[in-house]
């Protein structure tokens, strides 16, 4: 499977647009990860017209395909995967054809995980306590990795716009997450930083201007 050359860009004010419903388009993100992940926060904004399930974030290693995976099952229902285990969150604030600001946190010490959507948070749940994510990660936007870097299913693909993707190796404070929800960043992600993003694209993926804040 070939990739285009690695880009490193400040994508402030830009979005990735994936307009087609198939297994070809995706974005591979190249993260600055040099130690095991024992806590994390991943934030992004997305806008999609799909009602079916779709994958928002997929991190695989050579030993496990669903090390970290965030899947929108249906309107208001989201599934998180950590270390091959999964949890469903229901009745979350959601919408179609509108911007959704989302953050997902997980701390291996306790296993506590939580979702934030448009400023409102879910209840905290427990998944994979004391788990550690090791090995070279493959991080993909737009598709679910059923194998390391591949195994894509078009029925789980994302169609729409995604922007402001940040990934930290810690759980952000509620105040920092609320800043993000309002379009501000106190400190960019140290693993993935939208303002200095390293990425490759495959298939019909376009970089367009964002209308989240005008």
Identify what each model region corresponds to.
Residues 1-214:
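Extracellular glycan-associated modules
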């Amino acid at each position: 499977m070939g990739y285009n050359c690695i880009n490193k860009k400040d994508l402030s004010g830009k979005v990735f647009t994936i307009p087609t419903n198939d297994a070809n388009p995706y974005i591979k993100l190249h993260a600055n990860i040099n130690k095991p992940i024992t806590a994390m926060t991943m934030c992004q904004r997305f806008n999609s017209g799909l009602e079916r399930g779709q994958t928002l974030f997929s991190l695989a290693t050579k030993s496990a395909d669903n090390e970290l995976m965030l899947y929108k099952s249906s309107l208001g229902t989201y599934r998180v995967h950590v270390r091959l285990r999964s949890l469903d969150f229901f009745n979350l604030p959601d919408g179609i054809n509108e911007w959704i600001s989302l953050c997902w946190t997980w701390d291996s010490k306790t296993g506590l995980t939580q979702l934030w959507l448009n400023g409102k948070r879910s209840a905290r749940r427990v998944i994979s306590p004391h788990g550690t994510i090791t090995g070279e990660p493959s991080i993909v936007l737009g598709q679910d990795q059923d194998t390391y870097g591949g195994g894509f299913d078009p029925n789980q693909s994302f169609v729409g716009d995604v922007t402001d993707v940040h990934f930290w190796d810690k759980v952000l404070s509620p105040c920092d997450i609320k800043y993000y929800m309002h379009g501000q960043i106190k400190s960019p992600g140290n693993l993935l930083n939208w303002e200095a993003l390293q990425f490759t694209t495959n298939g019909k993926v376009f970089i367009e201007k964002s209308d989240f804040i005008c």
